[in-house]
Swiss-Prot record:
InterPro entries: ATP_synth_B-like_membr_sf, ATP_synth_b/b'su_bac/chlpt, ATP_synth_F0_bsu_bac, ATP_synthase_B_chain
Protein name: ATP synthase subunit b, sodium ion specific
Species assigned in the record: Clostridium paradoxum
GO cellular component: plasma membrane; proton-transporting ATP synthase complex
Primary localisation category: membrane
Spans through the membrane: 5-27
Family of the protein in this entry: Belongs to the ATPase B chain family.
Gene from which this protein is expressed: atpF
Amino acid sequence: MQFASFISLDWGVVFQIVNTIVMYLILKKLLFKPVTKFMNDRQESIANSIKEAEETKKEAYALKAEYEAKINASKEEGQEIIKEASRKAEMRADEIIKNAQNEANRLMEKAHIEIEREKQKVVNELKDEISNIAILAASKVIEADIDKNKHEKLISDFIKEVGEATWQN
């Protein structure tokens, strides 16, 4: 009997064990499964958010690289446009300078021609004037009774002297 008292069960402990098992099963059914489901859903949601953020980050880097490439291309195109405009302006300036030099040369040539023409006109007027003076002098000499040969020689010598003197100047 002693053995029976040693094996005797304390029904209070058995009820506590049964209650703990029942409580565990109820909590597992009502609390652990929803909490576990909630935790798994939350973990999946966070993983999806991280994945979307990484994809968005990759897209942002791709767009950034694309925009930087476009900006660099625009800068290069702008520099090319500026170089081309500068080259055209330089060519236009050279053309204007060349035209101005040609016009100046043309005006100088025209002025030289006009000066030569005026010089020739003055020389011709002087020759006419000298001829008139020579004729006047000749008529005065004739009045002084010089023979005809001497008179002609005197006039031609006078014209030669005056003509050579004016041509040499």
